């Protein structure tokens, strides 16, 4: 009898929750900002604290910063609707917009490029030196890795082993430790490396300007769109926002240009294939 009562109460709770208005059912849920894992989780949580606090105050809700072990897992979480606001590079933003109804809001003014880096001493001097060696990148679905792999193919590099790691600072440290001949990182992450790390590295190749980190809002937060956009712009004008943008060399927010995300479709398609979506 006790078992039956528990079962009845459990079903009743589920039914009751389903009958509640949407706002009431999710009233206690925090607003989750999912940051693509371009660097270590510790650094991401620290880096985005000013934004978290500003949005919490502006929206009047609890705000959490979350990330993922790698770009592939991040994409899966975003597709599974784990984030209210996703901050990820243009190719994943395009996927989320085109296939999963996320709404693009803003990107950063600072140029975003993918870099192929090597060490000052002992690294490859040109693309042909990378054949038969190990090159270090982020996950197979990260923009810098996808562009870097295309660059290797265009350059005629053969028999290259790609080793995937979780963060840009790990790429740099592994190169300096002699565990790879070259690596793929973004320009912003390269600029954020410690000066003593940067001096041991050099840029072998760089991409044209690409669409970097884009803020895309989950469709379930459509009613909050105007408030979220206003909060982002006010953050950029606040003292803490200006410090954040200057410290991370981001220059500020800007609106996306017409067709800018659509131009990332070839890279978005590679993510689809990697995730088994086509």
Predicted segment positions?
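Short helices/loops that flank or line small-molecule/ion binding pockets
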Residues: 72-86, 99-100, 128, 168-184
């Amino acid at each position: 009898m006790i078992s039956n009562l528990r079962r009845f109460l459990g079903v009743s709770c589920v039914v009751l929750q389903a009958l509640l208005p949407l706002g009431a059912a999710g009233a206690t849920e925090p607003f989750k900002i999912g940051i693509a894992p371009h660097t270590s989780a510790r650094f991401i949580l620290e880096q985005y604290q000013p934004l978290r606090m500003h949005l919490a105050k502006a929206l009047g809700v609890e705000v959490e910063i979350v990330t993922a072990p790698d770009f592939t897992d991040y994409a899966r979480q975003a597709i599974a609707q784990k984030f209210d606001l996703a901050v990820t590079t243009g190719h994943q933003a395009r996927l989320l917009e085109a296939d999963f109804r996320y709404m693009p809001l803003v990107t950063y003014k600072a140029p975003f490029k993918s870099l192929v880096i090597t060490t000052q001493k002992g690294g490859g001097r040109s693309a042909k030196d990378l054949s038969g060696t190990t090159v270090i990148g982020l996950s197979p679905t990260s923009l810098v890795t996808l562009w870097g792999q295309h660059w290797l193919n265009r350059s005629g590099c053969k028999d290259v082993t790609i080793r995937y790691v979780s963060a840009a600072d790990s790429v740099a440290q592994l190169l300096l430790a002699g565990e790879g001949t070259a690596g793929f990182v973004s320009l912003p992450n390269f600029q954020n490396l410690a000066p003593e790390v940067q001096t041991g590295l050099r840029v072998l190749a760089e991409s044209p300007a690409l669409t970097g980190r884009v803020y895309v809002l989950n469709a379930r937060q459509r009613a909050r769109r105007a408030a979220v956009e206003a909060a982002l712009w006010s953050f950029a004008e606040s003292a803490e926002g200006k410090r954040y943008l200057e410290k991370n060399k981001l220059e500020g927010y800007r609106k996306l240009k017409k067709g800018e995300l659509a131009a990332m479709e070839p890279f978005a398609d590679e993510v689809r294939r990697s995730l088994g979506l086509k």
